[in-house]
Amino acid sequence: MTRTITPSITDDDALIEATLRPRALDDYVGQEKAKGNLRIFIDAARGRDEALDHVLLYGPPGLGKTTLANIIACEMGVNIKSTSGPVIERPGDLAAILTNLEAHDVLFIDEIHRLSHVVEEILYPAMEDFQLDIIIGQGPSARTIKLDLPKFTLVGATTRAGLLSSPLRDRFGVISRLEFYTDEELAFIITRSARILGMEIKTDGAAEMARRSRGTPRIANRLLRRVRDFAQVKADGVITMKVVQDALALLEIDEMGFDQMDRMILLTIIDKFGGGPVGLDTIAAAISEESDTIEDVYEPFLIQNGFLNRTPRGRVATKAAYLHFGRIVPEPPQGKLF
């Protein structure tokens, strides 16, 4: 199922994000704590003419990890080489990337938690000592030589920090968690994006769109493009609150930002499993979706906003979920006295 509000990046997102992406920390909206810390670390590194310490960015998808990696390179005045964990299959792949870096360059690895153990072993000395261990020959005659690397900055991004091995995580000097955005921050981002794309948007239209964007800039920008299409064909081209409401009604995105899949998850727990607790794999089987996708993509927003609880016994729909769908909230079971 194709989701308009999935925080995962799509081909359309990749094409347009380059246009909308800020290039400097001062232009980056939100994430004030992470941004403030990075400003200090970047200014200090530039003042000493050193490479920035390695940076780990983690949090739900669509919150700006890739954007921050590019901003770090721009602020440091260096080049950035971007790749992802699944692409680096063999140690030789990583060695080829590392040996092509220049002094102080940024190496950005998205989905860094998906690096294989063998590749990680090559990365440890590269991060810590800026050396690459290369094995020449095979068997008893094999020997290891150390190749010096330029001092570089590794920026790793992950949605699942818990899957990182401790040795890898401990080698990052800067670790920042990105949080969901406020409606006010998203409205500012939407207004800025509309201006860049040459759209006219009213304040109430931006606020309504922000409210339904699930705290995620990537979703906000995607909704903006879909509402722009609606405004062009069904209205006078100006994005107002009424235009946003009508457009998102057609896309089946409700006032909380829920789409069909969110409703399916919560209603399955409520209607089929008595509100829970129910195991993740059981939910996945009931709605024909992958367990990892539910856990990484759908659940964070539902949990953050109090519609779902994750317990040791399984997932439980909250009172807010029952009320949102007009269901009667069940009475808590009465404990036995004897």
From Swiss-Prot:
Gene3D superfamilies: 1.10.8.60, P-loop containing nucleotide triphosphate hydrolases, Winged helix-like DNA-binding domain superfamily/Winged helix DNA-binding domain. Residues 255-338 are annotated as: Head domain (RuvB-H). DNA binds at R310, R315. It is found in: Cytoplasm. The RuvA-RuvB-RuvC complex processes Holliday junction (HJ) DNA during genetic recombination and DNA repair, while the RuvA-RuvB complex plays an important role in the rescue of blocked DNA replication forks via replication fork reversal (RFR). RuvA specifically binds to HJ cruciform DNA, conferring on it an open structure. The RuvB hexamer acts as an ATP-dependent pump, pulling dsDNA into and through the RuvAB complex. RuvB forms 2 homohexamers on either side of HJ DNA bound by 1 or 2 RuvA tetramers; 4 subunits per hexamer contact DNA at a time. Has 3 domains, the large (RuvB-L) and small ATPase (RuvB-S) domains and the C-terminal head (RuvB-H) domain. The head domain binds DNA, while the ATPase domains jointly bind ATP, ADP or are empty depending on the state of the subunit in the translocation cycle. During a single DNA translocation step the structure of each domain remains the same, but their relative positions change. Homohexamer. Forms an RuvA(8)-RuvB(12)-Holliday junction (HJ) complex. HJ DNA is sandwiched between 2 RuvA tetramers; dsDNA enters through RuvA and exits via RuvB. An RuvB hexamer assembles on each DNA strand where it exits the tetramer. Each RuvB hexamer is contacted by two RuvA subunits (via domain III) on 2 adjacent RuvB subunits; this complex drives branch migration. In the full resolvosome a probable DNA-RuvA(4)-RuvB(12)-RuvC(2) complex forms which resolves the HJ. This is Holliday junction branch migration complex subunit RuvB. It comes from Geotalea uraniireducens (strain Rf4) (Geobacter uraniireducens). The gene is ruvB.
